[in-house]
Curated annotation (Swiss-Prot):
SUPFAM superfamilies: Class I glutamine amidotransferase-like (SSF52317), PurM C-terminal domain-like (SSF56042), PurM N-terminal domain-like (SSF55326). It comes from Equine herpesvirus 2 (strain 86/87). Gene3D superfamilies: 3.40.50.880, PurM-like C-terminal domain, PurM-like, N-terminal domain. This is Probable membrane antigen 75. It holds the Pfam family AIRS_C.
Length: 1345
């Protein structure tokens, strides 16, 4: 008889080794939650009162050490590995000293100590996992687990009881992911073992079955086509019941290894996937699903949209809502960013609780644009006996997480998987793949394995399961029934980002190696976990063989794995999730009526004061500036983004669309690494070493001589836009989708020209699982299909997710206000260099015209109606042919150059649209409302359309051009001169209805972003006055300015002498695409190298003249992870010597960009010459005396941002006149804008006077600079200087060959990559930053003489 499994699975840890626990404390300011708690309860009357000045907090570091492994005593490793750990984590505690004793006073009846952090007795947090992977790469063997928490101490006026403790508990922890720690007993025992499960999975109550996702995306019980496919308009091929809408394109594949070569340019397909998720679901599940569709993809851009409750003081949980919005967006966006994906567009829609209570359930929609070479999509036939492989570490999630998302997706883990597959894709063995399927949505391992196998089943071996699951099973001596339950609990019933593949059993190549062996080799080179789980078989289900010993025969190697289920310890069938979610509801229900929520009433317009109402609408989070979010996430780093959210000189987040260029670099002629011939897409000039000697110091000769006569070369890519109308979905679930699709069209029509039939839209659904949800959902998605068919655009439903949970028969169904939402994202292939419009107004005296799809003024479902009235008016249907006509009309006007700016009319109505255009252009506008209608009705109308800026001389031509399209056009206002303080003015019949300054309009519009910063950014104190001093950067390109403005750089190549540059990619990091493109564009042959290449021989970089380190790690704590990964290179003697030999070899250069690049050069002692005190002109040998313990003697580190937040900013930089930098010598004295992204964007010195020594030696390569292009205008305050400490933003070695920059000039190599080009040089044809890379190429070629 089976034993009682519940007795085997208590709520405490299961297995542990001999361990030792250490606790360390470090000084800290209050966290945002602690600060609010102290502010709210200090000195106030009530049941809980904190004494003033008696609250404090510290960082709390918990380290679990392994004392032994087998017969090996690991205790001698504790001290050196703890020193290394303290070094790596120093930035995370703001370089405070980590001490085993707290400096805070505790004890006494009224003293309260509250320690908290990630649940210690559960799965490691994602931060701890990523740090653990870094420590493993450094070969740290005694550090078992590291968690960073908080130590909060306060003194109360009352005695501490349960009620007081409950208040503190509710303020600081959530019990889902962050829990209170009780370390005393554990510290005495020296044991803090853990299970592999998150708290949600440990409870066992959560089941990963989303009824909406299943009903929308999976086949019906009778194998009928899924609803999502029925509602799609496309006739494209189906991949596992998922419609793939693709557009053609090109993509570069870069070589790996120790020989520089040309990249390969491949024909490719581009796909857009939209993923609907609920708060706390895995942030990268959509990206991992897309990887199963296109296994060798490159994701080049993403959108991230959030739905939530409007923060309100009256609600009583304003702090919680602000926190959820911020934490949720940050978790999704940063997971994408650290996967190498810029977030280029998105939205935020908040619902006032009086209109739609959400129970704090924040919803998210992410869309990712991925490109994959067509030639890599060939697969093998699926058969029995093929190998089933799992890639990636097992990091299970068993239920929804909660802010601050300590169990969020790991970009580090996903990067290792993507890099492994991309390397494998460059081998012939890639055709061995016969299956990569994955279930869409939030699904279990069991469901993913079921989707992987189109027929039959699999024989899996227990010894091949992840170690995290095996540690809970080995040696337990349980029955087969209990073993089955343990495997279910710890592996099959949880979700993870492991990627499963099926590979055929057949030798590849002359050596006869199996395909899985090629994949295993690629995984080892990229630090990716790899396991062959078993083989496919004919019998359905999963059949587990017990090879754990004790009669099982021991672990079985892949070649000996059988594929017959005979002798399996137990088997598990594949269950249909559709049958599990089927519910019957009453027939004959009026579905349409249930989806239309109307509460009509007469609006008393006179009760609304124009001034107050306009400002109220502009400050609503749905309308207001999203700059807090936009400036916290990477939006540029891959170098492919031509238009991101920021518009105009002030970088205001107003773009209606984004532009992403194809990930292909074609400016080379010759044979690629994959041996195909390639002709350059631009004219090249071959030069010799002697010619390089003559050209190297004459940069004015590098530019073409035809001035502005050169024809514009097309730059292919994609335009991407979002659309959603959540308020209108409340009014009508059927018609609301039409307005969301229309918003995609009105946004994207302002971009480069394309045919509307080329537009492809993907839809993601959040739906309330209440009564009749299936019938309502079917009605809504089919209405979307019909509308798209009338428009003539492609539509595919890509995911679904419940927005609210139905509690079953004993619970009341969700109320009628629970959310039903459909989010849309559209893409089209375009020439990104073609004419287009942004909201930035250009000229005084220009007129504004309003185009709309009809003459109705529409306040139904508007922000005004939602926020100000409490009413819901009926929505009129949208006429598809009028939307199509307006699209064609606007595109014609743009193509003919008749209009100069444009912005779609959407959230906030006409007044918000015009105000945003005025802010983007920094010039006033005057609007005139026709008589006979209340002006506020017109101002707040959200009738789909656009406002266009038209030069007065073009007005007649524009009106004439609109006539054939039947568009409704009105001249509504004028653009005012840029003199003095601009105003937004609204008149009617000669009377002023509204008038206010641009400064006041800006204050209202940015109020929500300011509120977010005040809550989550660090206190800037007196420097707060400078926080809005951002943007409007002047430029001074010195003697090269005219050449850059009027000409293009000549593209040089040296066919006689190979000029190679290595680009370093460390495990868990992303390929630095912008740097690779910049190098190839400037003449280099390149190759991506990893630690194995560096360690393979002392001369592992002998074929290269340049070494570039750029990009980000996959870890959330990017700079700390950078320190760890680079230290791994330093600790590996062979790799260290290879790097030092290269750095000291004559004629080489290195370029470190961003936090990772700067850390690399700092760790190898490149900048230590300032303290060398000799060594001649070069300052001596680089890295002299460097050892694996040298990290304690570092002179230079990176400083944290003053905001204590990630920053993504377009800043001004100045190259000092006296810099020794070889790469920057032709830019000396220049003041240029560039992109910077990171959490540590400043230089920190560990020796007094070091900055002065660096300056005197000419080792400072770059300074943060102010707005004005004047030498003295150094930037000393945040945000122009992100750290507000040292102005230094770049350093070089004493000989100038090695350069480290905190900005990324490779992402500003082309003028089209710039956030904004100053009006004075509006026709800029060459970015001065390209001169840096050309200088490196010519100098390197020159040195070969």
């Amino acid at each position: 008889m089976a034993s009682d499994v519940t007795q085997l699975l208590p709520g405490i840890p299961y297995r542990h080794e001999n361990q030792e626990l250490r606790v360390y404390y470090a000084d800290s300011e209050f966290s945002p939650a602690e600060g609010r708690f102290v502010f709210n309860y200090t000195g106030r009357a009530g049941d809980l009162t904190l004494l003033r000045g008696r609250s404090d907090a510290e960082h709390l570091l918990v380290v679990i050490l392994r004392n032994g492994s087998g017969d090996e005593d690991l205790r001698p490793l504790h001290a050196p590995e703890l020193r290394l750990l303290h070094f790596i984590l120093a930035p995370e505690v703001r370089y405070s000293h980590l001490d085993p004793r707290s400096r805070l006073e505790g004890g006494g009846d009224r003293s309260l100590t509250f320690d908290y952090g990630p649940a210690l007795y559960r799965r490691v947090s994602t931060d701890a996992f990523e740090l653990g992977r870094v420590l493993t790469l450094i070969d740290c063997r005694s550090l078992l687990r590291v968690e960073l928490g908080r130590h909060f101490v306060t003194r109360l006026a009352q005695y501490i009881g349960e009620d007081e403790m409950r208040v503190v508990h509710e303020a600081l922890v959530n019990d889902t992911s962050v829990q209170r720690w009780t370390l005393g007993g554990a510290a005495q025992r020296g044991e803090v073992p853990a299970t592999a499960l998150t708290p949600a999975a440990e409870g066992g109550a959560f089941v990963m079955r989303d009824p909406v996702s299943i009903y929308l995306m999976l086949p019906r019980p009778d194998n009928a086509m899924p609803l999502g496919i029925q509602a799609s308009t496309a006739a494209s091929p189906l991949v596992r019941q998922y419609i793939i809408l693709t557009t053609p394109g090109t993509m570069s594949v870069f070589p790996w290894g120790s020989v520089p070569k040309n990249p390969s340019v491949r024909e490719a397909v581009t796909h857009l996937h939209s993923e609907a998720t609920s708060m706390g679901q895995p942030q990268l599940q959509g990206q991992v699903f897309q990887l199963s569709l296109l296994p060798f993809y490159r994701v080049s851009g993403a959108a991230c949209g959030v739905y939530s409750v409007t923060p309100s003081v009256a609600s009583g949980y304003e702090d919680a809502v602000h926190g959820e919005i911020r934490e949720t967006h940050e978790a999704h966006a940063r997971c994408l960013n650290h996967s190498g994906v810029p977030v280029t567009c998105g939205f935020l829609r908040t619902f006032d609780e009086t209109s739609a209570p959400l129970s704090l359930n924040t919803l998210v929609c992410t869309s990712t644009l991925a490109t994959c070479p067509v030639s890599m999509l060939t697969t093998s036939r699926f058969m029995r006996g093929q190998y089933i492989v799992a890639l990636g570490d097992f990091l299970p999630v068993g239920g929804p997480d909660a802010p601050p998302y300590v169990y969020r997706s790991s970009s580090f883990l996903c990067n290792t998987i993507v890099n492994t597959l991309n390397m494998f894709g460059k081998t012939r063995a890639r055709i061995c793949i016969s299956g990569t399927s994955r279930q869409v949505g939030f699904a279990s391992t069991h469901a993913h394995l079921g989707s992987l196998l189109p027929r039959g089943g699999a024989v899996l071996y227990l010894s091949k399961l992840p170690q995290e699951a095996l540690s809970q099973i080995r040696g337990r001596g349980v029955s087969r029934e209990d073993l089955r339950e343990l495997v279910n609990r710890f592996y099959l019933r949880v979700s993870s980002h492991q990627v499963f593949l099926v590979l055929k059993d057949e030798p590849v190549g002359d050596q006869g190696r199996q395909g899985y062996q090629f994949l295993q080799k690629a995984a080892g080179l990229n630090g990716c976990a790899f396991r062959v789980l078993g083989r496919t078989c004919d019998q359905e289900g999963l059949h587990f063989v017990d090879d754990l010993g004790e009669g099982g025969g021991g672990e079985v190697p892949p070649r000996r794995m059988g594929y017959s289920p005979e002798g399996a310890a137990f088997s598990l069938p594949f269950e249909s999730p559709v049958k599990k979610t089927t519910r019957e509801y009453a027939e004959g229900v009026d579905v349409q009526r249930g989806m239309t929520l109307v509460q009509e009433g007469a609006l008393e317009w006179d009760m609304f004061t124009p001034y107050a109402t306009v400002h109220a609408v502009l400050s609503h989070p749905t309308v207001a500036s999203k700059e807090y979010f936009v400036r916290r996430v990477d939006r540029f780093s891959n170098g492919l983004v031509r238009q991101q959210q920021g518009v105009g000189a002030l970088d205001l987040p107003l773009a209606d669309y984004c532009l992403v260029v194809d990930p292909a670099v074609e400016t080379f002629t010759g044979t690629s690494f994959s041996r195909e011939a390639h002709e350059a897409s631009a004219p090249l000039e071959n030069i010799s070493v002697q010619e390089a000697l003559e050209l190297a110091d004459a940069p004015e000769r590098w530019f073409d001589s035809n001035g502005g006569a050169a024809a514009r070369r097309p730059v292919p890519g994609h335009v991407l836009a979002c659309g959603e109308q959540g308020y209108k979905m409340i009014n009508s679930g059927v018609l609301g989708g039409q307005y969301g699709i229309t918003e995609v069209v009105t946004n994207i029509m302002l971009g480069p020209a394309f045919e509307l039939a080329q537009l492809q839209i993907t839809a993601a659904v959040h739906w309330n699982e209440g009564p009749d949800y299936r019938a309502q959902l079917e009605r809504a998605v089919m209405a979307c299909r019909e509308f798209c068919a009338e428009l003539g655009v492609g539509l595919a439903f890509s995911s679904g997710c419940s927005s609210a949970k139905y509690g079953g028969p004993s619970h009341s169904p969700p109320g009628p206000d629970s959310l039903n939402l459909i989010s849309f994202a559209g893409k089209a292939r375009v020439d990104t260099s073609a004419p287009r419009l942004t909201p930035e107004l250009h000229g005084p005296g220009h007129v504004l015209i309003h185009l709309s799809v009809n003459r109705e003024v529409l306040v139904a479902g508007s922000v005004f109606e939602h926020k100000m009235t409490g009413l819901r008016h009926p929505l009129p249907p949208v006429e598809a042919h009028r939307v199509r006509n307006m699209f064609q009309c606007v595109q014609a006007l743009v193509a003919r150059g008749l209009v100069t700016a444009g912005h779609d009319v959407s959230d906030g109505g006409l007044i918000a649209c015009c105000a945003e255009m005025a802010l983007a252009g920094q010039c006033g506008v005057t609007l005139d409302i026709q008589r006979g209608i209340h002006p506020l009705l017109v101002l707040f109308s959200e009738t789909p359309g656009a406002v266009l800026e038209v030069p007065l001389g073009n007005l007649a031509g524009v009106l004439e051009a609109c006539e054939p399209f039947g568009c409704f056009v009105n001249q509504i206002g004028t653009v005012e001169p840029r003199t003095g303080e601009g105003h937004v003015v609204v008149t009617q019949g000669g009377s002023v209805v509204f008038r206010d300054s641009l400064a006041n309009v800006m204050n209202s519009w940015t109020s929500f972003a300011d509120e977010q910063f005040s809550r989550f950014g660090a206190c800037l104190k007196e420097a707060e006055m400078y926080r809005k001093d951002y943007g409007d950067n002047e430029l001074d390109a010195g003697s090269l300015e005219d050449a850059c403005a009027g000409g293009e750089l000549t593209l040089y190549r040296s066919p006689g002498r190979r000029v190679g540059a290595a680009v370093l990619c460390l495990p868990g990091c992303t390929e630095p695409l912008a740097a690779l493109h910049a190098l190839v564009n400037s003449g280099f042959e390149v190759s991506v190298v990893g630690p194995e290449d560096l360690a393979s021989s002392r001369d592992g970089l002998g074929a290269f003249a340049g070494l570039v380190v750029s990009g980000v790690t996959g870890a959330r704590a990017n700079y700390a992870a950078s320190r760890g990964l680079v230290q791994g290179l330093v600790a590996e003697r062979a790799a260290r010597e290879t790097v030092l030999v290269f750095l000291n070899r004559t004629g080489t250069f290195s370029l470190g960009l961003g936090e990772l690049g700067m850390e690399f050069l700092c760790a190898f002692g490149v900048f230590d010459g300032a303290a060398a005190g000799g060594g001649g002109e070069g300052g001596g040998e680089v890295g002299r005396g460097l050892t694996d313990q040298s990290f304690g003697n570092r002179l230079i580190e990176l400083e944290a941002n003053a905001s204590e937040l990630p920053e993504s900013l377009w800043l001004n930089f100045r190259v000092p006149w006296n810099t020794r930098s070889v790469a920057l010598r032709h830019l000396a004295g220049n003041i240029l804008p560039c992109w910077a992204y990171g959490t540590h964007l400043g230089v920190r010195y560990r020796a007094d006077g070091l900055e002065y020594s660096l300056d005197a030696l000419g080792m400072i390569a770059l300074h943060y600079h102010g707005r004005r292009a004047q030498d003295w205008n150094f930037a000393r305050n945040y945000p122009r200087n992100p750290t507000a400490v040292s102005t230094v933003a770049g350093l070089c070695s004493r000989d100038g060959r090695h350069l480290g920059l905190l900005c990324d000039p490779s992402a500003a190599y082309h003028p089209w990559q710039w956030q904004h080009v100053p009006r004075r040089v509006a026709g800029l044809r060459t970015s001065p930053w390209a001169v840096l890379f050309h200088t490196l190429f010519l100098d390197t070629l020159k040195s070969m003489s």
